[in-house]
Amino acid sequence: MNSTEYIRLCLVKRNNMSVAELAEKTGQTRQNLSNKMQRNEWKQAELEKIAAALDADLDIRFIDHATDEPII
């Protein structure tokens, strides 16, 4: 699962929050956020804003390809 897919799942878990609502909460336009989601290119600062908008903490982990488990 890539970062954008994970963000979309989180939006569903947060009472079906829309991309427009997330964009507003992160201080950007819906179009700008949609473009970032299409490219699936995120800076850590952007992910931190999204986490804050979702009332969550950002947890970055490396996942082993063979086992699909976190390395640490």
PLM regions and their residue ranges:
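Residues that mark the N-terminal boundary/hinge immediately upstream of a DNA-recognition element
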Residues: S18, K43-E46
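DNA major-groove recognition helix of helix-turn-helix/homeodomain DNA-binding modules
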Residues: A45-I60
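Short alpha-helical DNA-recognition segment
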Residues: N15-L33
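Key DNA-contacting residues within the recognition helix of helix-turn-helix
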Residues: S34-N35, E48
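Residues in the recognition helix of alpha-helical DNA-binding motifs
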Residues: C10, K25, K36
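Residue-level detection of the helix-turn-helix DNA-binding "recognition helix"
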Residues: V12, Q38-W42
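A short, Lys/Arg-rich alpha-helix, primarily the initiator
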Residues: M1-E21
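Short, charged recognition helix plus adjacent turn
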Residues: E24, D59-I72
